Design a protein with these regions (language model features):
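General small-molecule cofactor/ligand-binding pocket signal
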Residues: 39, 103-107, 168-169
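Glycine-rich active-site loop/strand segments that organize a redox cofactor
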Residues: 48-90, 215-249
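Extracellular/periplasmic catalytic domains that process cell-envelope and extracellular macromolecules
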Residues: 61, 134-135, 161
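Short, flexible, glycine/charge-rich loop motifs used to bind or transfer phosphoryl groups or to couple energy/partner
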Residues: 1-5, 29, 58, 101, ...
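Rossmann-like dinucleotide-binding core of oxidoreductases
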Residues: 3-10, 14-15, 20, 25, ...
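Conserved N-terminal glycine/acidic-rich loop preference
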Residues: 2-26, 43-75, 94
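Feature captures the FAD/FMN-dependent oxidoreductase FAD-binding
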Residues: 79-148
Length: 249
């Protein structure tokens, strides 16, 4: 691919990634340091990071959404464990509400980041739609996560190439995959498997088998009615705790 060079864009802060970390950093920068300029470089076409990448059946948060979401933009949905679609909607709405989306450069693949001690600046080189983009800033924030977006981890099982069926990694779930009535084996019992397997079973899979190496504890999903009660109770409990704390100290 031919890359066309371009001029350098100077900002105070360069943020890599438009997922939870990148959006959170962008908000805190403007909240605590008004007037600070920044740019968010996102390789994908959408906001969300991992939550835009993972599209397998049943994808959802594997922890309480109240701890996953931003403290400055509380979650208002009824569920305590949110599905991937609602999380993406939340991230997009939040970025738009606070104007963060205006600072995001999509389809921008960072190729290098170099520190210059002579002027204390970072120079980031990226490809954006066939054009080389250069960004220079005093601070560089990596919100790029720890996944290999190009290829999910796949163990080298002997005989895998002799298997005649479909081999699918949840990280790159085909939109047109037809598993209706099929026998499916899921290797692993982590968060992905726990969310994937019930969704497969409920949406037409013939039989689903999970292969598990190490036993894990699994609890039932929180009930929506209980979640609403706890949320309303939290408004009462927290002030009481503050009063007791202030009186004790």
């Amino acid at each position: 691919m031919t890359v066309t060079p371009s001029e350098t864009t100077d900002v105070d802060v360069i943020i890599i990634g438009a997922g939870f970390s990148g959006l959170g950093a962008a908000h805190r920068i403007t909240e605590r340091n008004p007037g600070t300029s920044y740019v968010v470089l996102e390789r994908r076409e959408q906001i969300g990071g991992t939550w835009d990448l993972f599209r397998y059946p049943g994808v959802r948060s594997d922890s309480s959404i109240f701890t996953l979401c931003f403290p400055w933009e509380p979650w208002t949905g009824p569920e305590r464990v949110a599905d991937g679609d609602h999380i993406r909607e939340y991230l997009n709405a939040t970025a738009h509400k606070y104007g963060i989306d205006q600072h995001i450069r999509f389809n921008t693949h960072v190729r290098s980041a170099d520190w210059n001690s002579s002027d204390d600046t970072w120079t980031v080189t990226a490809d954006q739609d066939g054009t080389e983009k250069t960004y220079r800033g005093r601070f560089l924030f990596f919100g790029s996560g720890y996944y290999n977006y190009d290829e999910g981890y796949t163990p080298d099982f002997p005989g895998l190439n002799e298997f005649d069926g479909s081999i699918v990694h949840p990280q790159h779930w085909p939109e047109d995959l037809d598993y209706q009535g099929k026998k499916i084996v899921v290797i692993g019992s982590g968060a992905t498997a726990v969310t994937l397997i019930p969704a497969l079973a409920d949406s037409g899979a013939g039989h689903v088998t999970m292969l598990q190496r190490s036993p894990t504890y699994i609890g039932a999903l929180p009930d929506v009615a209980i979640t609403r009660f706890l949320r309303s109770s939290r408004l009462v409990v927290r002030p009481m705790l503050r009063i007791r704390y202030s009186r004790a100290y």
